[in-house]
Structures are given as C-alpha cells and as structure tokens.
Amino acid sequence: MPTVNQLIRKPRKPLVKRNKVPAMQACPQKRGVCTRVYTTTPKKPNSALRKVARVRLTNQFEVTSYIPGEGHNLQEHSVVLIRGGRVKDLPGVRYHIIRGVLDTQGVKDRRQRRSKYGAKRPK
C-alpha cells in the first residue's frame, strides 16, 4: 500500500472502461452489407463449422458477425441488421446478425425461442 507522499507524487489512475462493441457507436443495431459469407472453426475444446459473415456497416466499419440458427439464406451483397454480442468460442466475432429482418430470413420450423430467430408462430 502506498504512503501519502507516494500518492501525492504519483496519484492513482482511474480505470479505463474499454468498449466491447466499438463499431456500433452507441447504437442498438446497425445495418450493413455482407462482403463475404463463410464458415470457421471454434477454439480448442469445441469442434464445428460456425457460420459467419464479414459485414460492411453504414458507418464504414467492417466487422465479422455470427449467423445464429440452423441454415441461412445469406450471400454476398445481402443487407443485414447486426446487434452486439460476442461468440465465446470464435475469436474476433463480437456481433450477431438479427434473423428475420431485411434480407435475412428467420429459422425454418423453429418452435421454441422463436423471437430470437425471427420465426413466425406455427399454425
């Protein structure tokens, strides 16, 4: 623990809060255009082919965002809406694409947690 004199000489530095989603610029969602749609593999204990898209946002940021749910209709030049939220086992993926909005279709035959995947209520 520092002495009073040490604190006078060199005061305590306030902690800097890092922004986890800088490309959003304090917006809840942002629109963008897919520049590349591809699959990638997760970090060590997990194994899969995760679907991700490189998205060029309206504020000229280029980000990698995750495509949730089973199956998707995205391709290059698809217009998508993204939200913040990282994918723990994909390094560098800090955003999610919102399903059922703009060019992204909702997940087909989804019965539970439908609102998260843009699926309509089944008849």
UniProtKB/Swiss-Prot annotation:
Keywords carried by this UniProt record: Methylation, Ribonucleoprotein, Ribosomal protein, RNA-binding, rRNA-binding, tRNA-binding
One GO location term (cellular component): small ribosomal subunit
MF (Gene Ontology): rRNA binding; structural constituent of ribosome; tRNA binding
The keyword rRNA-binding appears for this protein: yes
CDD domains, A to Z: Ribosomal_S12
Modified residues (3-methylthioaspartic acid): D89
InterPro entries: NA-bd_OB-fold, Ribosomal_uS12, Ribosomal_uS12_bac
Lineage: superkingdom: Bacteria
Extent of Basic residues compositional bias: 110-123
GO biological process: translation
Region described as Disordered: spans on this chain: 104-123
TM ranges: none
Family annotation (Pfam families): Ribosom_S12_S23
Family the UniProt entry places it in: Belongs to the universal ribosomal protein uS12 family.
Complex and partners: Part of the 30S ribosomal subunit. Contacts proteins S8 and S17. May interact with IF1 in the 30S initiation complex.
Function, in words: With S4 and S5 plays an important role in translational accuracy.
Identification of the protein by name: Small ribosomal subunit protein uS12
